[in-house]
Amino acid sequence: MNLTDYVNEVSLEDFAKPFKHHAYWNKRLRTTGGRFFPKDGHLDFNPKMFQEFGQETFRRIVRHELCHYHLYFEGKGYQHKDLDFKRLLKEVDGLRYAPRSTKERGSINYRCQKCGHCYKRQRRINLQKYVCSFCRGHLKEINQSKD
């Protein structure tokens, strides 16, 4: 079963209304479970939420996005701040907030070979291009935290 069919199934079971647009996986999403696009009505979902938290949590994320979807097309308040949205979300047992990932991003540590200053970065530094900002000495990777 593809994602659009799954979202339509959830919509019919939990809202008794069809989902008439498309649903897509969007691997660029990081902190959110999904997004609703009012302009064309499609939904994007974060595949990491499904992989990390499982089917039941993902179903609750789908319900959350479907609340936005159905309220928008009914002409009611579909934003998080609207009472219509809050009521419908509670009624269908959707998630209010996306769960936080338990995986921590690793950091990379660099040390200047001349003055010993340490730099902590989340992204790699091109050691051929960049130097220490204090003494212009060469940098060296000293260790990398585990993901």
UniProtKB/Swiss-Prot annotation:
Keywords, in A-Z order: Cytoplasm, Metal-binding, Zinc
Compartments where located: Cytoplasm
Cofactor note: Binds 1 zinc ion.
InterPro entries (alphabetical): SprT-like_domain, Uncharacterised_SprT-like
Pfam families: SprT-like (PF10263)
GO molecular function: zinc ion binding
GO annotation, biological process: response to stress
Domain SprT-like: 5-142
GO cellular component terms listed in the entry, alphabetical order: cytoplasm
Principal cellular location given in the protein's record: cytoplasm
Active site: E65
Cofactor(s) of this protein: Zn(2+)
Binding site for Zn(2+): H64, H68
Protein family membership: Belongs to the SprT family.
NCBIfam families (alphabetical): PRK04351.1
Descriptive protein name: Protein SprT-like
